[in-house]
Amino acid sequence: MLRHGISARLVDGYNIIFAWEELKAVAAQDLAAARGMLEDILSDYRGYHRCEVILVFDAYKVKGNPGSVEKRNGISIVYTKEAETADAYIEKTSYQLRRDHRVRVATSDNLEQVIVLGHGSLRLSADAFHAEVEETRGQIAALIEQYNRANRGRNTAKIKE
């Protein structure tokens, strides 16, 4: 489980994919590619914010599916088991984590938002989460640029030696 006190983000994967235009366009051609793009985006987000990210995808319609949890690029990726929706998994997990962690849930499902808010979690609509992710991307780009500027002279000095 998570280290005590660490902040957690629970992300309703398909809800986000079909709410964000850039992912929705990719999903229309290749859903697996859209999932991969979201994983990459959230991996960068996790690294910058130093939080735990749990990305949840529905797999409840897959007959006999036991569900799975994988750790890739620092984020937990959950595929729900047969007869368990992403919403049900997010509700259960936000309830379990609420006591020892600051939990934020990213989804535009209104009922889901009300339920997790009742558990004491914070909620983010897909649009609000997209804005936060874009701001994070800008901050990461600025840090990289600042690092590159600071090290430009050092790298050329080493090459000349």
Regions found by a protein language model. Name each.
Residues 1-11, 15-161:
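Nuclease catalytic cores that cleave nucleic-acid phosphodiester bonds
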